Amino acid sequence: MSLPAFAPFQDLAKALLAHWSGADGDGSHDTSHLQRVWKNAAAIQAKEGGDAEVLFAATLLHDCVAVEKDSPLRAQASRLSAQKARQVLKSLDWPDAKIDAVAHAVEAHSFSACVVPTTLEAKVLQDADRLDAIGMVGVARCFYVAGRMGSALYDPADPHASERELDDTRFAIDHFRTKLLRLSTGFQTVTGTRMAIVRRDRLQRFLDEFADEI
């Protein structure tokens, strides 16, 4: 793990990661994911403002309870992580107001939880996490998760779902239309939206080139 990637909060990172149970072998939600989300969050916070310490803690704890994508508990993952975040920060003697702020940001970051972010830090974290799901990293993560779940790359009989329902549990490429392209239009901050436009273009370019090869 590269603590310099968590600058300027390396000491806090060390304290928080001591409570992180790991990603249970999920390379799409490992410490490199935390590093990328923090890179995104720091870039957005530099333009939009907000409490950087709260944002950092929320970033490191946003996936602290691991739930597989195909689990029936998936929609509860951010709520479970928020509960654990409260316990962790309480053990570190954080003030209640900051604990509440971190917990809300953690709970609201998730696409599947459908919790509306009401604070700037929560909006920044949601944007930062969603940025890691689109663009070329998003492409890599999509196919990585599909491989773990045993999904096919695409439906050879109808790769573009012209005459069938989209099904991203069976076909990896369907996930672009069921989620990833939708993610790119729902950003909370001006800075996040600008970053998302660039990455959405990369997603679309990948889809176009993929379609040309099958």
Named regions from a protein language model:
Residues 52-71, 77, 81, 101-111:
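His-Asp-centered metal-binding catalytic motifs of divalent-metal-dependent phosphohydrolases/nucleases
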Residues 2-19:
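Short alpha-helical hairpin
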Residues 85-123:
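Hydrophobic, well-structured mid-protein blocks that either form specific transmembrane helices
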Residues 24-26, 70-73:
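A short glycine/serine-rich beta->alpha loop
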